[in-house]
């Protein structure tokens, strides 16, 4: 219920002109929502050369038509390649290329100086927009459970087959995806009772800010 509120706020902030802080943070949150990245930490970026949404550098992205292509090294040294399609986010990325500095997600302060966004900025924005103490990590746990739910909803699936696309989307191992991201109720349902559950499943219609699978998971 808080997610549609956040997504409406993202649409509003990303529609603004200029490179204000709220628009830049909204761009990061949109990327978290769409691509399920880790939020990023500057310490890991400098010491381990591993990156998340807030620490992405210009060299990590390219624009191919209407897609934003990301190629970067994530946690545990895993090389990731992602394609993201979003009109407002693409418009922002085109604009931010003109700023000095290596960081992809920057804003202009009151003096006109370019400043990078950090994880604290992102988590504060999410909590304020959703009116609850949610953080960037919740996008990964939510996204993981939505993917797992979809596997269950669309046909008989083994536990291994349910977890595989989650691990792929998150850039995690199947073991970590199961332990730390997928809701335990979905794990239990996959092991026992999925056929009976599926026979009574009626997915709601999608709304502007929630997909059918998201609404089904909430229900």
What are these regions (language model features)?
Residues 2, 6-24, 28-51, 55-219:
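Extended accessory and catalytic-adjacent subdomains in large enzymes
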């Amino acid at each position: 219920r808080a997610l549609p509120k956040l997504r409406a706020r993202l649409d509003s902030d990303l529609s603004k002109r200029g490179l204000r802080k709220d628009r830049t943070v909204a761009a990061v949150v949109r990327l978290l929502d769409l691509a399920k990245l880790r939020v990023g930490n500057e310490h890991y970026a400098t010491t381990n050369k591993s990156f998340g949404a807030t620490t992405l550098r210009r060299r990590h992205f390219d624009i191919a038509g209407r897609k934003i292509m990301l190629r970067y090294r994530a946690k545990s040294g895993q090389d990731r390649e992602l394609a993201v399609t979003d009109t407002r986010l693409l418009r922002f990325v085109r604009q931010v290329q003109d700023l000095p500095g290596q960081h992809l997600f920057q804003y202009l302060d009151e003096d006109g100086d370019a400043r990078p966004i950090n994880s604290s900025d992102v988590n504060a924005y999410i909590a304020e927009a959703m009116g609850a103490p949610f953080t960037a990590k919740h996008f990964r746990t939510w996204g993981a459970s939505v993917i797992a739910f979809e596997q269950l909803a669309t046909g008989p699936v083994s536990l291994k087959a349910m977890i595989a696309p989650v691990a792929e989307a998150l850039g995690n191992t199947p073991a970590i995806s199961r332990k730390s991201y997928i809701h335990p109720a979905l794990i239990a349902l996959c092991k026992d009772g999925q056929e009976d559950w599926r026979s009574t499943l009626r997915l709601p219609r999608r709304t502007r800010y929630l997909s059918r699978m998201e609404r089904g998971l909430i229900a």
